[in-house]
UniProtKB/Swiss-Prot annotation:
Species of the source: Saccharolobus solfataricus (strain ATCC 35092 / DSM 1617 / JCM 11322 / P2)
Name by which UniProt lists this protein: DNA double-strand break repair helicase HerA
Residue positions binding ATP: R142, G151, S152, G153, K154, S155, N156, K459, I460
Any one GO MF annotation of this record: ATP binding
Domain notes: Contains an N-terminal HAS-barrel domain, which mediates interaction with NurA, followed by a central RecA-like catalytic core and a C-terminal four-helix bundle.
Originating gene: herA
Catalytic function, reaction form: Couples ATP hydrolysis with the unwinding of duplex DNA at the replication fork by translocating in the 5'-3' direction. This creates two antiparallel DNA single strands (ssDNA). The leading ssDNA polymer is the template for DNA polymerase III holoenzyme which synthesizes a continuous strand; ATP + H2O = ADP + phosphate + H(+); Couples ATP hydrolysis with the unwinding of duplex DNA by translocating in the 3'-5' direction
Length: 500
């Protein structure tokens, strides 16, 4: 169906069409000329009247025109972003359309050949079309950012993607900041308690958690020797069955204290020893709810074909950072081990999802998670570790990490500084697409990157089940409290009557 014709000057990047009828933003169109079959996306629509242009400033003239003839002539113009030449392996057109070239609405079958055939995971359908959009699972190794304003559908997107990846036999690990997924109706759910086991930590990692500075060489040496001796000793006793599981945590604490005292006996080391002891005791107090030597390694906890969810809701931000960074390190190191030997390490690829990523990957603060996330962003693809970051504050994210997220699912974004920040950190997001972000409805998204063949404007599927991130039924909850109070008052009155 013809919707309009090219007018004015066009380029291989964009064209302007004069439409025969009103057209919607996000409509896919086809322009055929000079053996080119160009697919385009309408990114801007304007309507006006030659009789009532911007120079009109007399309201009485407008009123008289309306009285004289109610059908004032109007026009509709639409800007078309050229996406590809469907006759040339989906490369960009190398010839611009000429004035008068007809633009027709793309047919479903044409769009299905682009968005429905090569992917493995259905994410939704093109807005206004009966065309499903499937994502390329292999390209998740190039990392993904899911960005949106609060309430625009981030959690729903994560739930839909995670469940469908698990249904393909894949493994997803979600660091659940608000507990949205831990008690959800996601199928194939594997709940993981957040624990840190020093037996699976390196001396450097342990010293970082104790906040021993890199230039504090004597302090690090004291801690390193004590940590290695104690953890090796505990491992040997465990093998020989000489230590009960129930006393592991208390024994680690006492053995570390004793060994630190021994390591720092000389006068030269005395002040450094005291400093390390203080930091160790502070560490054990701060992380008492997550330190657990009876806990198995995260590598043993994550399962293939599962949505593995680590609940962070009971932790403060320091503990969250410690847990997330440790798990990221173990996953990356373990995948490296498997790639090298095939006999040890994590045997399957995994996608790690960091919710509230602006907290852990802030552009203004250095965190342990930020270090290991940046390592995965650089190295993870080679070892089958994909990183997905989720945030409603894109401008708060570290720009180096965000720029390495080759794929992006961007839902409604209103804040201009957020849009600008996303645009500056994305090689494959154009300004005209970025301008559409504020006009998206809840659950609608622009998808760019290697996970789709071409940029897609998509209505994300609705997750079928409970997610705690949904808006609460406030009236319903108020009524429940009111009923409870009435029942309690009834019992109180009943007791008073008996007493009388």
């Amino acid at each position: 169906m013809i919707i309009g014709y090219v007018i004015g000057q066009a380029t291989t990047q964009e064209a302007l069409i004069l439409a025969e009828r009103p057209v919607r933003l996000g409509t896919y169109v086809v322009l055929e000329y000079d053996n080119v079959k160009a697919l385009g996306l309408i990114t801007n629509v304007t309507r006006g009247s030659p009789m009532l242009d911007d120079n009109m400033n007399d309201i009485e003239i407008v009123q008289r025109l309306k009285q004289f003839n109610n059908s004032i002539p109007v026009y509709t113009k639409a800007k078309v972003k050229m996406l590809c030449d469907m006759n040339n392996h989906f490369l960009m057109p190398d010839i611009p359309p000429f004035a008068g070239t007809p633009a027709r609405e793309a047919e479903d079958e044409e769009l299905k050949s682009i968005y429905s055939q090569d992917g493995q995971i259905r994410i939704g359908s093109l807005i206004g079309k009966n065309v499903e959009v499937k994502l390329n699972i292999n390209s998740f190794a190039r990392h993904l950012a899911i960005l949106a304003a609060t309430g625009s559908g981030k959690s729903n997107t994560v739930a839909v993607l995670s469940q469908r990846i698990s249904e393909l036999g894949g493994s997803v690990l979600i660091f659940d900041y608000h507990g949205e997924y831990y008690d959800s109706d996601i199928k194939n759910l594997n709940r993981i308690e957040p624990k840190l086991n020093p037996l699976y930590m390196t001396p450097r990692e342990f010293s970082t958690l104790l906040e021993i500075r890199e230039n504090a060489i004597i302090q690090y040496r004291i801690l390193r020797r004590a940590f290695i001796k104690v953890t090796n000793g505990i491992r040997e006793k465990l093998k020989e069955g000489q230590i009960p599981f129930s006393t592991l945590n208390s024994q680690f604490y006492e053995l570390m204290k004793d060994e630190l005292e021994t390591q720092g006996n000389s006068d030269k080391k005395s002040s450094a020893k005291d400093e390390v002891l203080n930091k160790f005791e502070e560490f054990m107090d701060r992380y008492s709810n997550v330190i657990d030597l009876t806990s198995s390694d995260i590598i043993e906890k994550v399962k293939r074909g599962k949505v593995n969810v680590v609940s962070l809701t009971q932790l403060d931000e320091d503990s969250m950072d410690a847990v997330v960074s440790h798990y990221l390190r173990r996953i990356l190191d373990s995948r490296k081990d498997f790639k090298r030997s095939k006999n040890s390490g994590l045997k399957f690829p995994i996608i790690a999802v960091i919710e509230e990523a602006h907290v852990f990957l802030s552009k203004n603060e250095n965190t342990l998670t930020k270090y290991w996330a940046s390592r995965i962003a650089r190295e993870g693809r080679k070892f089958g570790v994909g990183l997905t970051i989720v945030s409603q504050r894109p401008k708060g994210l570290d720009e180096n990490i965000l720029s390495q997220m080759t794929n992006k699912i961007i839902l409604k974004i209103i804040e201009p500084t957020d849009k600008k920040y996303i645009l500056e950190s994305s090689d494959n997001l154009s300004e005209d697409l970025a301008e559409q972000l504020s006009s998206l409805d809840v659950g609608e998204a622009i998808i760019i990157g290697k996970i789709v063949k071409l940029p897609a404007v998509v209505k994300i599927d609705m997750f079928e089940g409970k997610l705690l991130g949904s808006d609460p039924d406030m009236i319903g909850e108020w009524k429940k409290v009111e009923e409870s109070e009435k029942i309690a008052k009834g019992f109180a009155d009943f007791g008073t009557e008996i007493g009388d």
